[in-house]
Amino acid sequence: MNFDSLSIKEAAVNETVSLSAELLDPMQLGERAANCESSAELLAMLRDAIAQASAILDERYKQNLSITDIVHGRASVIDQVLRIAWGRQQWPDQFSIALVAVGGYGRGELLPHSDIDLLILTRKEKHTAYKEAISGFLTLCWDIGLEIGQSVRSVKQCQQEAAKDITVATAL
């Protein structure tokens, strides 16, 4: 391996790590969310975090930062926001449900103004026990200002849909 190419790769990785740290500190965001006393306060805090990160990403774009780093940075910010929104819900059985990023967002590529494609994956086909928590999660996401494209399916339903539709298979 050429040392010059290694240095270039290390610099690119360091720049991406530096950008992620600059955009959002997950620990700090989690602590701030835990200290929110109302839903309105949580919404304002999450909206502000997204707006601040977007402003940094916009500035980095103007400074010719790699587009790849920018779209990965944007996805990383949304990852943190979704973790908080998901964690605020009262899940009847948190081990039988999962939030899965799919599509471009699932690849870590989130362009400005893109929708955020999510699969809410359940162990069983009947997910009525989760209806209220899913509704609360999606409502919180929409209130934050996120454009969510979502589906709620069991593993078996995902397999059936993927067998029928190649676009579902590639999105998964």
Describe the function of each predicted region:
Residues D79, R83-K131:
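Active-site nucleotide-donor binding segment shared across nucleotidyl transfer reactions
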